[in-house]
Amino acid sequence: MPKINQEELENILQTKINNLDLYLSAFTHRSYLNENRSFNLPHNERMEFLGDAVLELCATEYLYKNYSHPEGELTNFRSALVNYKMLSSIASRLGFEKFLLMSRGEAKDMGRARQVILANCIEAVIGAMYLDSGYQTCTNFIAREVLVELDNIIEDGKYIDPKSRLQELMQEKNGITPHYGVISETGPDHNKTFVLAAFVGEKEVGRGTGPSKQEAEISAAEDALKKNLF
């Protein structure tokens, strides 16, 4: 049975752990069980389901109590707080990767798949924390590690999705709406990679990659915003 350094994890989470197995399960990706049949704890997907609900409730409650914005903006704030990119960056900052249990194949993938695994992991850890210590402990952790990002999200306009931000900027500057085109599409049906470009008229202003056309468009819009070629 793999071991987790309880004292180290308690220091990271800033909470006392009563049942370490809950956290060991929270760090266990489904793929690990395929290579370790004797492992006698479940993978983290059910715990992730629970933690996702706790995280969303905590974020919603905080936004409702502290911000007077309309419902649509509060929803956008919350989405920016709990999307996989934000959660994976928080999990990386906390050093969760050292605790992850996954297959050798998954361990080699350092791209988007790893980001998703880390995002799911932090939700599972919140689920474990809820079962181990209750809602208030989760609230303290979420406020300290997740909600602290909110001011930057609002100040930088990160709650507005990149495609909407790019469109607003383009229409302000020259009244043109950007459009997107497929550059390439590779891979089998179950694991495709799309490369799309963002265009202003005939000029390419950004390019992005993703497992779906929608995500590649978002990536292209992000690239265009960074390059600011329009």
Model-assigned labels for residue ranges:
Residues M1-F230:
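Double-stranded RNA-binding/processing signature
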